[in-house]
Every structure is written in C-alpha cells, then in structure tokens.
From Swiss-Prot:
Lineage: superkingdom: Eukaryota
Function: FAD-dependent monooxygenase; part of the gene cluster that mediates the biosynthesis of andrastins, meroterpenoid compounds that exhibit inhibitory activity against ras farnesyltransferase, suggesting that they could be promising leads for antitumor agents. The first step of the pathway is the synthesis of 3,5-dimethylorsellinic acid (DMOA) by the polyketide synthase adrD via condensation of one acetyl-CoA starter unit with 3 malonyl-CoA units and 2 methylations. DMAO is then converted to farnesyl-DMAO by the prenyltransferase adrG.
Enzyme class: oxidoreductase
Protein's UniProt name: FAD-dependent monooxygenase adrH
Disrupted-gene phenotype: Drastically reduces the production of andrastin A.
Lipid bilayer topology: Single-pass membrane protein
Gene: adrH
Length: 476
C-alpha cells in the first residue's frame, strides 16, 4: 500500500434490526468495525405484545456492552416461582433467587419493545440503522457481497449477517445461492427442519391483585401451559402455549388472528393458575396481546461464502425456558469476537474470502453444540409443561417438587459456559462470580437423580391406581 493511502475498511451488513442484530451492531461499534443495519419495518421498536426474559448468560454480554444497567432498572428481579396443576395442587420454589446468587445476575422480564428502544437509543451511530429496507436479493461478488432491497438500494460489504428471525430472507437467499454454487448442499431434510406443534398467545397485562412483582407462575395444564412473569409496578408478562392437533412443517403452519387468541383464552378462562387467579384475569387486564405459531428447529447450514445467519434464523425454540433471545445474544458474542480477530489481524489488508469462510466455520463449531443443547432443553420444556404424555404428567405432578437440586442443576448447566465477547472487559459484578462455569459443588445431584428414577418407577407400577386421581385422560 502506498504511503498516505487509507487501508480498506471491512464492512458488515446486518440484516434485521432485531435484538441480535442491534447487539451485533453495538459489538462491532466497540471494535471499530464498519457496519450497517437494515430493518424491513418502518420502526425499530414496534409494540407487538411480545416480551423477553434476560437470563444471566445474556445479561453478562449486555453488561459488557454497557447496556444492562438500562434494562435492569426497568425490571423487578425474579426471586420466587409458583407451580400449579389441574387438580389444584401447587408448590413454590426459590430457584430464581438461587440462580441470581450463583450467577450474579437476576432473571428479568420486560417488553421486547423496551429492549429494542434501549439498544437503539444507546447506539452511537444511528445513521447506520436504516429502516424500510426489505431485502429482495443477495449477491456474491467474489471479493465482496451485496444486498439489494425492494426500493432498489444496493448495500455492498464484506460479510452479510442474517439476524432477521425465523422467516429469514437471508437464509432463503443463502439456500438459493447454495443451490446454484453447490447443488445438493441444502438437503430436503434441512428444508423441512422447522416444525410447528404448538401455538402461543403472548400478552402483557396491568397489575393484578395477588400477583407480586418479582414472582413467576408456571401452570401445567393438559396439552397447554400458562406462564407468567410479574415485573416492575406489577406489570404482568404472560404466555399460553397450546398443543396443536397435528405437526406442521414450515412454512405450512397455521396463522392466527386476534379472534383466535380471544377464542383460546375464553375456552380456558376459568382455569385457576395460582390461588384464585384465573386465565380470565390475565385476559381482562391485558394491555396488548398476539397469537402466533411456535416454530422449532435447529439448522445444519449456518453459513455460505460471505453469508452467515444467527439467532432465530438458525435455531428456533419455544419460549418455555426463556433462552431464545439469550442464545441469539451468545451467537453475537462469538461472531463479533471472531470478526474482530480476523479484521484486526492485518491492518493493511482485508481478510480474504477463504479467511472469512474459515472464520464462519469456526463460528458454527464454537456455537453448535451449546445451541443444540439449549434447543433440546427448550423442546423438552414445552412438552413437559404441557404434559403431553402420561410420564411427563406424573413426574411433574408427583416428583418434580422433591428434586429441586436436580432442576437447579439442569438450569445451571443451561446457563453455565455462556459465551462472552473476548475483546471487551469482563463485567465488574463477575469479579466475585462467573457465568462461564458452575460453582464448585454444582452439577452433581446424584441422590436426586436416583430419587427421580426410583419415583418414576414406583409411579409406573402404580399407574392404574393413579389414573383415577388425575384430572384428564386425554393423554393416556
């Protein structure tokens, strides 16, 4: 390079102004790497009735970026959970408080809209976030790549990141290009990865007497569950998950209207979820609500050439264990760390195409097994909470309360080992604790594993007698 000439800048095109997309923008900004965010909607933070839970594995990354405090002050940390069953039985647990003590961050819930607002308002270069840019095509140009949007705009860069959700246009374009460049790479099985077995009504309600801030309810129904989180000033975040009568393969999944949400909630309005609180109370006090099909799936192809996908674009899970957004944030941490490493390895030259491909393969290698484990636990959680067979119903009702250490262990394993951004300092609060490993003594509740299996065997032997005491026979 001639003296006085500026080194070429590596540029990342982020498609999707999602939580993952904006978190990546913050990460790249901190690394001084050029980027742009393209959002198809007119607004970055629309109110759609959705909410998210920020768990310790996601919180530590947002804390690294200086964003967590703004979120935390809007919420009430979770300290207690209540579990209830169709026969009226219930019990409580301090698992959320224990998680807080172990990992130094509480579990918090807040409007997805608020999270997006905080990510946007705290972003230093808002001109790099461009709305009304719906992608129509991705082009691979050898030494670069470009994104074409429906209004004819062309954005050229070195790496295209699809953070555009489960209906990802970037994933579709990646598949189209793979069919051209490597026929057979995207198998028929992969094209059918996403399935739908559940529908979900999301809602946010004003304060309801009897529901305390910082608490959480999980009602185990028969083929459905109701989960609530009680935030600051009594604001109630809730969702109802209903098992469908068949399994659908994406994109052939049901679509739902506000009337469908009302019909489902009316059908189960008298179901008591805790003490004298009913589903009808949630519905009558709602501020916003929406109903959607819940896709599930983990894709095998994460990248092609200069294209990569993350978050719901590559692994979609139900909200039962609250890890969808947190898993996406972990994707961001790994990808941003790798981009920073390859971009700053040579101040005079941009990374070659082969270097980028190697980096993206490493991204999948570093993330795949952890994402798969979280996805599988989420998948199990949906079926356990909705009691979709007799064994899950029996264990949930008669064993679950006696194996608190086992549940703590499983939850801790989901959170421990979380990825962080390697070029940013560790958050101050982790000086006395670490989310990237389990504290000594955690992770070995052998006696409770034994109790679980022995109890399950006893329940199986006494199954004919127990049937008469369970409220529904729909899953026999």
């Amino acid at each position: 390079m001639e003296e006085g000439m500026e080194a070429p800048k590596f540029k990342v095109i982020i498609v999707g102004g999602s939580i993952a997309g904006l978190t990546l923008a913050h990460s790249l900004s901190q690394a001084n790497i050029d980027h742009v965010v393209l959002e198809k909607r007119a607004s970055i933070a629309p109110q759609e009735g959705a909410f998210i839970g920020v768990w310790p594995n996601g919180a530590q990354i947002l804390d690294q970026l200086g964003l967590y405090h703004s979120l935390e002050k809007l919420t009430a940390p979770l300290s207690r959970m209540h579990l209830s069953f169709p026969d009226g039985y219930s019990f409580s647990s301090l698992l959320p408080k224990t998680i807080h003590e172990i990992f130094k961050y509480p579990i918090v819930s807040l409007d997805r809209q608020k999270v997006l607002e905080i990510l946007f308002q705290n972003y230093p270069n808002k001109e790099k976030i461009i709305t009304n840019q719906r992608v129509s095509e991705v082009r691979l140009l050898g030494d670069s790549a470009s994104v074409v949007t429906e209004d004819g705009s062309v954005f050229q860069g070195d790496l295209i990141v699809g953070a555009d959700g489960v209906h990802s246009r970037i994933r579709s374009e990646m598949w189209r290009l793979a069919d051209e460049l490597h026929p057979g790479m995207i198998t028929p099985q992969e094209r059918q990865t996403l399935t739908v077995e559940y529908a979900c009504v999301f809602g946010i309600s004003r304060a309801i007497p009897g529901l305390r801030s910082g608490e959480h309810i999980n009602h185990y129904g028969d083929k459905f569950c109701v989960i609530t989180f009680h935030g600051k000033d009594g604001r109630v975040f809730w969702f109802i998950i209903q098992k469908l009568d068949r399994v659908y393969t994406y994109p052939n999944a049901p679509r739902y209207s506000p009337n469908d949400a009302a019909e489902l909630c009316d059908k189960i309005q008298d179901v008591i979820i805790w003490r004298d609180i009913t589903v009808g109370d949630l519905w009558k006090t709602k501020l916003v609500s929406s109903m959607t099909a819940l896709e599930e799936g983990l894709f095998e192809t994460w990248s092609l050439n200069r294209i990569v996908i993350l978050g719901d674009s590559v692994h979609k899970m139900t909200p039962n264990i609250g890890q969808g957004a947190n898993t996406a944030i972990e994707d961001v941490a790994v990808l941003a760390s790798l981009i920073n490493r390859v971009v700053h390895a040579d101040a005079l030259h941009k990374p070659s195409e082969s270097c980028i491909e190697t980096m993206l393969q490493k991204y999948k290698t570093l993330r795949y097994e952890r994402a798969k484990s979280t996805y599988e636990r989420s998948r199990f959680g949906a079926r356990f909470h909705t009691r979709d067979n007799w064994l899950k119903a029996l264990v949930g009702r008669y064993v679950f309360q006696y194996v608190g250490g086992l549940i703590e262990n499983r939850t801790s394993k989901t959170l421990a080992g979380g990825n962080v951004i390697d070029f940013l300092p560790r958050p101050h609060r982790l000086e006395t604790g670490c989310v990237t490993r389990l504290p000594k003594g955690q992770g070995r509740p052998q006696q409770q594993w034994t109790l679980l299996w022995v109890s399950s065997l006893v329940l199986f032997l006494f199954l004919p007698w127990l049937r008469s005491y369970l409220p529904s026979a729909t899953f026999w």
